[in-house]
């Protein structure tokens, strides 16, 4: 009964044919990936803990059995989460033509990963703005027949269309998919914005 499946099931089936990795992905998986901001929206509406901040974390982010105990005890903290936008992690820097607008869409990231889609969050205001902007961008992807199966591609286009929606943080070592575990814990880490994403 997921919103992203009920609303866009036919689109996901079409986009499965566009996916160069369709042997390991399914239309249903695309819908789950796209549903993350809706899950956050639902959590905000319920808000059982009366919190001002929300954080999405894919369950696969904690698959390392040797994870630092400080992370396990404190993740996620809010000290690096903005109130009026979300925090996103880069895994590679933006390149010169990444912000090229084609068919009203910023960038084309079907064959490259620049940001992490599985760990992000922020204040209520930021998360709600993000949820709407993400779905607007997703609909544009569908309208322009741009592959939308990978949420981080749509996320990056969403951000590039409106950089005020997020802060993009840079891990000290590029291509660290799990850096936000460290940054949003009680480890002594200084947050650094990825300057290549400052538009």
Where in this protein do the model-derived segments appear?
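A short acidic, often aromatic-flanked loop/helix-cap motif at beta-alpha or helix-coil junctions
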Residues: 1-7, 95-96, 175-179
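Short amphipathic alpha-helical segments, especially helix-boundary/capping motifs
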Residues: 13-18, 103-105, 128-132
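Eukaryotic short linear interaction motifs
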Residues: 3, 62-65, 96-97, 128-129
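Catalytic core and acceptor-binding pocket of nucleotide-sugar-dependent glycosyltransferases
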Residues: 61-63, 86-88, 107-199
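Active-site-proximal specificity loops/subdomain of glycosyltransferases
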Residues: 1-48
